[in-house]
A protein has these predicted regions:
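Nucleotide-activated donor-binding/catalytic signature segment of Leloir-type glycosyltransferases, i.e.
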Residues: 12-14, 200-204
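N-terminal strand-loop element at the rim of the active site
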Residues: 1-24, 28, 108, 193-195
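Carbohydrate-associated surface elements
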Residues: 107, 128
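A short helix/loop element that forms part of the nucleotide-sugar donor recognition site in Leloir-type
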Residues: 33, 135-150
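An amphipathic, basic-hydrophobic alpha-helix
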Residues: 14, 19-45, 55-59, 63, ...
Length: 204
């Protein structure tokens, strides 16, 4: 299940659950994409956001006959780990599998697609956030501090997905130093993700 599943369905959208994006499941993924396109003929566009591993989705869509295949870059580096060599190879093959190249910033676009391709056909898509919803409101501040018993505390907050790029490990280490100077300080981390349990354990 995804975080936005209910919202997608409430707006009339449908969700198709495919195989995981991994080298071992690639043949299965190709068959899935072909079956999906044969069954859902109104689908003409695939928009992928899976870092380097989006190559599998894009190339599967290409072989299945999707006419529009959008690669969307969000990062300027790939995290270190056992999968890094595979991800680096996949990243280099993304441009050949996509028809359109989106990025949330110029640096991310150049990293994934190369400077020449980005300058010629890259599309900059700013992350869409309604700033009005998150503007400062004194009444909200007062209510939340009272609700969480933080009225006279120093509060540090972060809203971010629990993933390597957001560096919650460093955040917790820095806050531990702050706590020694200001014992009445509190750190609030809002988000979810694959590292949430690990960060909860580290915070203890």
């Amino acid at each position: 299940p995804g975080f936005f599943d209910d919202e997608v369905r409430s707006l009339g959208g449908r969700i198709f659950m495919g195989p995981g994006l991994s080298p071992l499941k690639y043949p299965e993924y190709l068959r899935y994409m072909k079956t999906l396109l044969d069954r859902e003929k109104e689908i003409k566009v695939l928009h992928a956001h899976n870092e380097a591993m989006e190559f599998y989705a894009l190339n599967g869509a290409k072989k299945a006959g999707f006419p529009v295949r959008i690669a969307h870059a969000h990062n300027t580096h790939l995290p270190r780990g056992l999968k890094l060599p595979v991800k680096l190879v996949c990243k280099e093959m993304i441009p050949g599998a996509a028809t359109d190249y989106f990025a949330c910033g110029r640096e991310a676009g150049i990293y994934y697609f190369g400077e020449k391709r980005w300058n010629e056909s890259g599309v900059l898509i700013h992350n869409a956030i309604d700033l009005e919803r998150f503007g400062y409101r004194s009444e909200v501040r007062t209510r939340l501090r009272r609700e969480y018993q933080l009225e006279d505390k120093l509060v540090v907050g972060s809203v971010a997905r629990f993933m390597v790029q957001k560096n919650h490990t460093r955040m917790l280490e820095q806050f531990a130093c702050l706590k020694k100077i200001y014992p009445n300080s509190h750190l609030l981390l809002a988000g979810e993700g694959e590292l949430q349990a690990a960060m909860e354990e580290k915070a203890k």
